[in-house]
Amino acid sequence: LIAFSISMGVLVYVFMNLSLYYSSIISPIILGSQLAIPFGILASAIMLGENISSKKWLLIFSAFIGILIIFFDPKLANNFLGLFYASLMALSFGLSQVYSRELRNLDVSLLNAFVGLIGFLVLLIISFFIEKNTLTNIISINMDSWLLISYQAIVVSLGAHLLMFYLYKFYTV
């Protein structure tokens, strides 16, 4: 549960924000995030011993080659660091999918609450050490930003993540 929470609640968001910071356009983030499924399949083979069919190996290979081919576009070549962090985000998400397989028996509300709590605490501690003045920064957030944060918390965390965690109970990575 802790590994899942760190992977999903901390690493995905850290790498997503780093990829946004280091990209001048959104394309590298979209491209890198497409690797979540291939990373998840590879992680399930390594960590859970699942068999990967030759068809899936071909699709995984095609996904990585496709990213390499697309990335020769000159606009994307200047955003390599953004793609790198987006790929790490996809890897973290893929790992969280594998970890979730072991958490099928937990209630999805408990799972979502634990991910949120661990993510909040770890990111808050990291923020204190890296950013300094964390409380001052939180207090200075304007109302429009709080509305966006509320949307993220309600629609994404309570809606989409709960549904995703629910589906993890029934489907393989």
Regions found by a protein language model. Give the residues of each.
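Structural signature of hydrophobic alpha-helical transmembrane segments
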Residues: 20-36, 79-91, 144-154
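Specific transmembrane alpha-helical segments of multi-pass solute transporters/efflux pumps
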Residues: 1-32, 69, 153-171
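Hydrophobic transmembrane alpha-helices of multi-pass small-molecule transport proteins
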Residues: 43, 52-72, 89-91, 123
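A helix-boundary/kink motif common to multi-pass secondary transporters
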Residues: 24-25, 48-53, 107-108, 172-173
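Hydrophobic/aromatic residues within transmembrane alpha-helices
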Residues: 19, 46-48, 52, 103, ...
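Hydrophobic alpha-helical transmembrane segments in multi-pass integral membrane proteins
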Residues: 11-17, 68-79, 120-135
